[in-house]
Amino acid sequence: MLSTLRRTLFALLACASFIVHAAAPDEITTAWPVNVGPLNPHLYTPNQMFAQSMVYEPLVKYQADGSVIPWLAKSWTHSEDGKTWTFTLRDDVKFSNGEPFDAEAAAENFRAVLDNRQRHAWLELANQIVDVKALSKTELQITLKSAYYPFLQELALPRPFRFIAPSQFKNHETMNGIKAPIGTGPWILQESKLNQYDVFVRNENYWGEKPAIKKITFNVIPDPTTRAVAFETGDIDLLYGNEGLLPLDTFARFSQNPAYHTQLSQPIETVMLALNTAKAPTNELAVREA
């Protein structure tokens, strides 16, 4: 713990990737209610989404304005009917263990996800993909059942279409676990102790801009009041989270203390009301329009 650190408190309105700016020290300690999990990029709870995003990356990435930009894929094209997409991958990316990230590795990850398609049935893209193959080391082709408007947007989601080194599959699959969380992202899970802490270190071989911080420790503190006390006593440097993880009254109290720097994000999610058109009464158009 660096005693000179001016502790920072973040209260976010929705879950987001953990970001540290260049002004931060080399090491920082924060807290989370649970361990980050085994960090299988293709599964859900107990894998913590923010931590999956620290280790694993997508072909394309969301921006704050909702646009989608190239990431592990540097460009793409699609057929006139919108069903066949060809991605040109970056040729300078390796997994944190040194394995190359190429079209074969990407295709293997898609296969692993789709072999467990029923688990991802909530995401329509998992139902739309009919074929994924490597055309060359840097060319990946994805074929869909039909033109699917939110294709790129769903590829950009934090899970399940992210990439782990194929050597870390178990029995050529990921649905029943992985050997180790080896991704292409800027962070490496160095150590994890159940109900105690998780330690991430910077991926020194990361292809992109490296984080300014070299090490992040997440202490496991389930109770929000205890987390707040740990922050006040200096046991942790930063609090981060949304309502429930960090009560807004606690945030309001800390924001009045000049010793702390507080920040409240803009909303980063869209809330919608979905109507079940297969069952009464919302199966009636007149009811839905009312």
Give the ranges of each region predicted by the language model.
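N-terminal lobe/hinge region of extracytoplasmic solute-binding protein
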Residues: A31-E80, E108-R111, Q118, I182-G183
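A structural "hinge/loop" feature
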Residues: V34-F50, L72-A73, E99, F151-P160, ...
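Gly/Pro-rich hinge or "lid" segments in bacterial periplasmic/extracellular proteins
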Residues: S67, P158-P211, K215, T225
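Aromatic- and charge-enriched surface segment that lines or borders ligand/interaction sites
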Residues: S75-R119, Q141, R227-A230, P281-E284
